[in-house]
């Protein structure tokens, strides 16, 4: 079993594979670094930290930890909370940009094939996922993501070292609004390898788009573009390599076309782009032969198709490929001369035209992407630098020279900002520090780009190109001689017969000077520009906007000077941002997973300067910040600094650090900055800051939710009121109460939640009273969801290991659409009947208005029609047939009573309920009467004279008493301001004290026994004893037990429900409560329960 099967990469029990952060290595040597990287690589851990620098080893396979799950995991997480990951670095950049209001950039470096392009894709994908936004922002995100396949198709190719090598460099700026939404972007591209269009080395390919077009073109496109087999084209068959392992050119072509569409390319524009690509291929098939020392097109037929595709005359194409117009000056006069070319010059002209066409097409695509992402003004940005890696081939030419120069500049930035600048900053700020030695590659950069004293290689090259008009070997040999004279004694330069050697930071590279001057000139002859401007295609003419009739003064710019300027501009741009670094390592040359070449990796570790990086990081400080910036970021931690510190900034920083109890040895105060040593101390600050913001966010959220809830309650009350308006009397204490919905707290009641579907939303849940065929009250839990009504009861387990235990059981699950209607009376009672197909359900709930209103809403949503409601004072409900009889209907009659307490009287198949008058039927809730806060369930008043077990007791039989202070009198629970959900208890009009009615003598329906009794002297003594520690006393003698009223069983009775008492004949039962309904409560053998009063006689 492999390690991947035994351990999940993010489990807390994960296998420790080396160290996550190489600052923690016990030995700081190249060998120790390589061993740690190897150990992690073999266990599929491709990321490792050196402080904030991310080291990435190319696995050459798809890894499993780049899913949405990891995006959620790393979003907002502190760096060391989770294993090293590119998402952690990206999230850190994104959050710092928003918090510090500073532009960020990430510099991805490494040699060709080390995984830089893939890393850039993951960064863009993460940002796209975690940033919000509407349709416009989503469009920009799509452009950002789809620009990758488009630019890869036209700018990437297979090389000996990398199957998807970037043959151009790009700096991608993702621009953001102040809210962190990507709303724009900009791409800067550098030095496209144009020579690849016309020539490739062995085992290499041209740019991907050529192979995609030949493989994926439709039948119509093949006919229109003259598509043939790949080996037919000279620009493709030189290397005899057409396929790449693991690449599907046909599928990639579809992706490229899709990306074009996202960029806003219409179908006609896409066709013109592909037509130009095909035209370049056909142009390469024009060959030349010698005729009288001059070049002649070998086959005139080969001119027809490229001329057709480019929209030019085939005769003019032939003329411009075999001759050139040259301007000569004689004694102040200038004249144009047509010069006929030889075979070598004609082939050079053809290739120059092909390279020029492709380069301008590529620039057009980049500009089109930029236009699609353009925004009027820049706010914040994150830059991603994905540039060609350091390259060493068997034969290295001008392109490799430029590529390696740019990589040398990037290494210099890394050294400047992580090694050199850090140490210089400690000195400037007066921080105690031990200097660390490192190699500064500025000396190599100066060798290449110096202008004077001594001139660098590029300056010498430009000078040769300006003074030597000849092309070919003559100019190149002159270059070699001048280089020997100018920089021959430089310690990082050597020359040999055919070229020179530069000792780069990544090692020695031998360059062949053959073709250096030609490629550096990078001039497209004016004849060819005129030829393209004569095209009948607007698209092609747009690619050549030059005005040739205006004389150009000065020396034309060279490729070397352009790349030097671009490199220096790039450095300036990067230095304006807060930099982050990803150092990519290529583990092998085979491009196979789990293949590790020790010497190759060690060489990369050495030239990337990882050892020096670890030493500086260990000896230095993980975080440094200007006092003002530090105060701005962490001001929220103390009241004195929020919203801003009004005193000296240095003292403000010290106040913050003292407030969070940071140890003095964990930081140092410089002259303008504070330096924090360990990342853990920084994480402490960040965590406290997050908690503060979280607390404020919760406060705002709570206020907003309260506002929304109040508005929602008002709407629900209005809807409920409209259902009962002019049809049913209302209770004073319920008309203005809040609707809560879940009165049972189902989140903490798994025994009830088990009956519901997974993630089923609950609209209403409460304990209610159900009446059976004998009008016996039974406790039930009623739950309403968007689709069903659940009635849940309890039963005692009769067998098995849980015998005797009481368990919840599902008594009924009713589909809402199966309801036939709901019946209610016109009185102010709490009773309602759910009319079903087989048998009805007669229920009582003090929250009936809330339940019925929600039920009506859900029924209408499900059935697309209103729920039938019946309001009558004589109701019927059907009961299920049991055994030989017992089916049929039961009647419920409502009549006027003397008091507002419902009185129930059962007789045969009829239940009579009498109670006083309520508020008029046209009563509506008022805003003024809205009770604030959550209703207190324990303060509910009884609504009728029924056995205690079904209304005045909670689930375990204990009497419910109010939580409020003071005596529990009738005058308390009738006021809606105190107990908003009080039911139809005594109905009294609120009056002044002077107008209150005189006390009535107690009647058989008096509820004064519910009041809390007078505390008396015992209460006063109890209050005096609060806070005094009692003296331990001896155990008192047991008092003789006093007997209350008792009764003897005349018949045997077996309880039908868990709250009923079972007994045999002649057993004596202690009477606890006698109820006029005929159901008494008693105690027998230590158990309490209900029993029928007509089964016993008093003794």
From Swiss-Prot:
Segments for region (Disordered): 916-945, 989-1045
Domain IQ: 693-722
Alphabetized InterPro entries for the sequence: Ie/If_SH3 (IPR035507), Kinesin_motor_dom_sf (IPR036961), Myosin_head_motor_dom-like (IPR001609), Myosin_TH1 (IPR010926), MYSc_Myo1 (IPR036072), P-loop_NTPase (IPR027417), SH3-like_dom_sf (IPR036028), SH3_domain (IPR001452)
Domain of life: Eukaryota
TH1 domain ranges (all copies): 728-917
GO biological process, one term: defense response to Gram-positive bacterium
Keyword presence, Ribonucleoprotein: no
GO cellular component entries: cortical actin cytoskeleton; filamentous actin; myosin complex
Tissue-by-tissue expression: Expressed in liver, kidney, spleen, eye, brain, lung, small intestine, testis and cochlea. Barely detectable in heart.
Region (Actin-binding) residue spans: 579-589
Keywords tagged on the record: Actin-binding, ATP-binding, Calmodulin-binding, Motor protein, Myosin, Nucleotide-binding, Phosphoprotein, SH3 domain
Name of a matching Pfam family: SH3_1
Keyword match Phosphoprotein: yes
Domain Myosin motor: 17-690
Transmembrane spans: none
Domain SH3: 1042-1099
Residues found modified as Phosphoserine: 1025
Chain sites annotated for binding ATP: 110-117
A molecular function (GO) term: cytoskeletal motor activity
Family, per entry: Belongs to the TRAFAC class myosin-kinesin ATPase superfamily. Myosin family.
Role of this protein: Myosins are actin-based motor molecules with ATPase activity. Unconventional myosins serve in intracellular movements. Their highly divergent tails are presumed to bind to membranous compartments, which would be moved relative to actin filaments.
Name of this chain's protein: Unconventional myosin-If
